[in-house]
Amino acid sequence: MSSRHRLDLDGSGRGDRRRSPNRRSRSRSRSPHRRSSPDRKRQIGAVGNMKIQINPYNNQPFSNRYWAIWEKRSQLPVWEYKEKFMELLRNNQCITLVGETGSGKTTQIPQWAVEFMKQQQQGQPPGQARLVACTQPRRVAAMSVATRVAEEMDVVLGQEVGYSIRFEDCISERTVLKYCTDGMLLREAMNSPLLDKYKVLILDEAHERTLATDILMGLIKEIVRNRADIKVVIMSATLDAGKFQRYFEDCPLLSVPGRTFPVEIFFTPNAEKDYLEAAIRTVIQIHMVEEVEGDILLFLTGQEEIEEACKRIDREIQALGADAGALSCIPLYSTLPPAAQQRIFEPAPPNRPNGAISRKCVISTNIAETSLTIDGVVFVIDPGFSKQKVYNPRIRVESLLVCPISKASAMQRAGRAGRTKPGKCFRLYTETAYGSEMQDQTYPEILRSNLGSVVLQLKKLGTEDLVHFDFMDPPAPETLMRALELLNYLQAINDDGELTELGSLMAEFPLDPQLAKMLITSTELNCSNEILSITAMLSVPQCWVRPNEMRTEADEAKARFAHIDGDHLTLLNVYHSFKQNQEDPQWCYDNFINYRTMKTADTVRTQLSRVMDKYNLRRVSTDFKSRDYYLNIRKALVAGFFMQVAHLERSGHYVTVKDNQLVNLHPSTVLDHKPEWALYNEFVLTTKNFIRTVTDVRPEWLLQIAPQYYDLDNFPDGDTKRKLTTVMQTLQRNAGRGY
């Protein structure tokens, strides 16, 4: 598929263009222009082999657009494997399918599963199982693919085809095919352990090994033992599918090749000091120097980097003047609204009258590795990094870190360049780094994450023996013990490891356990309206916009919202102001606030409100004029995050309670003083240890709200214990005096 070269980014033109003898060609001799017969064309919309022109899903005539899309579908590599797939599905309960990205598996296999389900239902009395579910590891993919498949089936999105993601459902009574995040299907299983309404379960992108996918696979193995009528399809884009095949009792494996063209791979001769700078430089070079028409796909690690790159590339292109071709920069990350996500499928701008080539440049997180296929991409830029969760159970710190990708991810990224014509992949790292420093496969998320949410969900599902749960890769016992300890301190499970009534209620919220506990407790403290808003703001990316060229103005704008007690209450001020200004985008722009983030937070708040209403949790507020208004909110924060507190030592440094980690307040905090006790939302590992999103709290609240955790008899010696002991003695004296 590729040949390897060295990439010259200093403009000297001295790049090494040696072909690697170890790289073998993966180009295929498949014809890209197979035509279909008229008979097959008429059959495709039918259930079974009847040649009909009526859509069987809505009883409407097929549109002209349907047939135009059908022509493209019939060219997909997976198309010729339909009969083989249907045969395997009829004769087996589980199937493993390997299909390279772009083979069409994500859009076609679920449609064929619906067709299979309809065939099975003919002549049968109506049953519960009338749905096909296809899981995706990312919400962007679930929404985007559902939109595409609704077009292919000539139905309305949200009717026969829909999607379900955290905080948003787009389905109806008519839905027969549902794309959903793996986390949403797992949440459904909590209330329906056998997933009775589903006839076919499809786990797509299983190779990504997300937490939810790994738990789902264990649950599905149990469901298969109890439901002979259910069918399961495990789909992967990598050749590591043998592991999935063995896990599911050596089920049949169907391999579908992609249609790939040769891809030249370029490495940098030396390591890049600033991969973002190198990536932007490479985009401009490709656009100006490459004579082949084709779009660019750049992989970056997150929203902030992507937005920054888009701005800088736009500025550079404008500076080149009208003689340069147009370059349309399109961001892609998980929190983009659906309409913005669909821009990646738009064509590139037209070429200039002077012949200069115009292109689009999609700048994406690793969602574009396998979850979405973007036609027209000829040039891929791979800096070699992605954001990954990393958890240290000994100090109970989970951080989202920028980490090197695996070789498997690098190969997937390179493959995006060879979808429609021969392409090029520019790797912004050395060939030596690729060969000796990158892991072969991405480490499964279950081996590097805090398992608090997972254990809570498993307990809700009735799993008693966590140690012997059928994990594909069992997590370390220490990580499981830390999760059980967390849930016990939060009173979600009792000392025998059994789920409490509070824990059962916490599991109903699509939130981390600490946030769920905080939200539930806030009803008793008469501040659930405010905690709803804070929880929503903590569940979305940072709302602050801080452009390099306007940092002073952005910081001044942020200071206008600052609350003296810290960042959580500052976020509450921002949300209140956003609503008071009628959710005005111009107000957001003027105040350096991300409008998309605020709209997402508002949606999250609405969904959480519905969960509260469903379980009769009061939505209340303390009188704003009362001195207890902010005190109650801060106490509610402590109810959820009492384990995430740092104490200011005599040395002037902060030390985390119990774990004794030296930390600093993050520079982004609005606090203009150093509180003695600081509750934090996030532990950030960079060149230093930082705590981010911080609020000033009182030590007596820690002792009163979480006495089990702050049992001073079991506390490590040190300045923190001495201070808390003094506070405890004061509380006891006051109690004795009847205060």
Swiss-Prot record:
Q: Which stretches does UniProt call biased (Basic residues)?
A: 20-35
Q: Where is this motif: DEAH box?
A: 204-207
Its protein name is Pre-mRNA-splicing factor ATP-dependent RNA helicase ddx-15
**Mind giving the lineage of the organism this protein is from?**
Eukaryota, Metazoa, Ecdysozoa, Nematoda, Chromadorea
> What does the record give under GO molecular function?
ATP binding; ATP hydrolysis activity; helicase activity; RNA binding; RNA helicase activity
Annotated function = Pre-mRNA processing factor involved in disassembly of spliceosomes after the release of mature mRNA.
Give the E.C. number(s). Answer: 3.6.4.13
Species per Swiss-Prot/TrEMBL record:
Caenorhabditis elegans
Asked whether the UniProt record includes Oxidoreductase among its keywords, one would answer no
Instruction: Tell me its family.
Output: Belongs to the DEAD box helicase family. DEAH subfamily. DDX15/PRP43 sub-subfamily.
Q: Which domain of life is it from?
A: Eukaryota
Matching CDD domains: DEXHc_DHX15, SF2_C_RHA
- SMART domains xref list: DEXDc (SM00487), HA2 (SM00847), HELICc (SM00490)
The Helicase C-terminal domain extends over 282-462
Report any one BP term from Gene Ontology.
RNA splicing
Answer whether the UniProt record assigns the keyword Transport to this protein: no
Q: Which gene encodes it?
A: ddx-15
Keywords on record: ATP-binding, Helicase, Hydrolase, mRNA processing, mRNA splicing, Nucleotide-binding, Nucleus
InterPro entries this protein is in? DEAD-box_helicase_OB_fold (IPR011709), DEAD/DEAH_box_helicase_dom (IPR011545), DHX15_DEXHc (IPR044756), HA2_WH (IPR048333), Helicase-assoc_dom (IPR007502), Helicase_ATP-bd (IPR014001), Helicase_C-like (IPR001650), P-loop_NTPase (IPR027417)
TM spans, by residue? none
- Listed GO CC annotations: spliceosomal complex
Q: Which residues form the signal peptide?
A: none
Which residues lie within the region annotated Disordered? 1-49
Output compositional bias ranges, type Basic and acidic residues. 1-19
Which reaction is catalysed here? ATP + H2O = ADP + phosphate + H(+)
Binding positions (ATP): G99, E100, T101, G102, S103, G104, K105, T106
Q: Which residues form the Helicase ATP-binding domain?
A: 86-257
